[in-house]
């Protein structure tokens, strides 16, 4: 509520009198150009930093009045760059809730669309990851991070660039895992790929530290503002990618046919 925040050493505010609400049980997406303040907003929820002025409230209570440990128990994170420990897959997921059983770990992995990961590992969930063990791709690591967040079962979830570095196949799996994670929870999501926020209950558009507009996807497209321009650019880029892929496939087919004729 009316939050202003300036990073240490910065000459201008990252957030300037920003206000928006995330209703309980809703998914709210933050979008905007690079440097608009999306990740800063997400970082203020768990008090990675504190606002210079204004307030960030969880359940109506200013986060600065909450016990830090209790606050962290209320929030699960899926970061832009997720890290796994040099430990088994099970222990990596179980770090969110150390008393979880193997069955609960498996259920979280299943919900996060990680069945293929478990199946390919030589010792399943007991396979060591990292140095001297198995390695996972960036998209696979993100799915394991989703499993960790699902197992934690916190009422609030913050996803920062959850699909930023995923390939198309992993992005689809991550989206299904996110759907499972979002069930019954309050979600604050930050993403550059606009396709991932279309189904959000509300989209808050940030621009240079200010709230430019907010509403549902269809409402914002119809409004013709910054979000509509971003969506048009996204659709244009997607159409170009499809056309380029089709052209490459056609050229490959032509080359194959000529090779066969020779």
Regions inferred by a protein language model and the residue ranges of each:
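ABC-type nucleotide-binding domain
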Residues: 1-262
């Amino acid at each position: 509520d009316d939050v202003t925040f300036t990073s240490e050493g910065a000459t201008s505010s990252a957030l300037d009198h920003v206000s928006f609400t995330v209703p309980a049980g809703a998914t709210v997406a933050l979008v905007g150009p690079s440097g608009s303040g999306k990740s800063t907003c997400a970082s203020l929820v768990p008090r990675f930093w504190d606002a210079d002025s204004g307030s960030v409230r969880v359940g109506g209570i200013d986060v600065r009045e909450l016990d830090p440990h209790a606050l962290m128990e209320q929030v699960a994170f899926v970061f832009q760059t997720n890290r796994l420990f040099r430990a088994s897959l099970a222990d990596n997921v179980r770090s969110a809730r150390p008393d979880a059983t193997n069955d609960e770990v498996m259920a979280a992995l299943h919900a996060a669309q990680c069945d293929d990961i478990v199946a390919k590992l030589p010792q399943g969930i007991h396979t060591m990851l990292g140095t001297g063990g198995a390695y996972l791709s960036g998209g696979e690591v993100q799915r394991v991070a989703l499993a960790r967040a699902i197992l934690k079962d916190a009422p609030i979830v913050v996803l920062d660039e959850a699909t930023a570095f995923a390939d198309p196949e992993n992005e689809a799996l991550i989206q299904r895992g996110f759907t499972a994670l979002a069930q019954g929870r309050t979600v604050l999501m930050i993403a550059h790929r606009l396709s991932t926020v279309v189904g959000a209950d509300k989209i808050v558009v940030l621009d240079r530290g200010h709230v430019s507009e907010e509403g549902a996807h269809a409402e914002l497209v119809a409004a013709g503002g910054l979000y509509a321009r971003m969506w048009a650019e996204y659709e244009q880029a997607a159409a170009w990618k499809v056309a380029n892929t089709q052209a490459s496939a056609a050229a490959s087919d032509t080359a194959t046919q000529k090779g066969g004729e020779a």
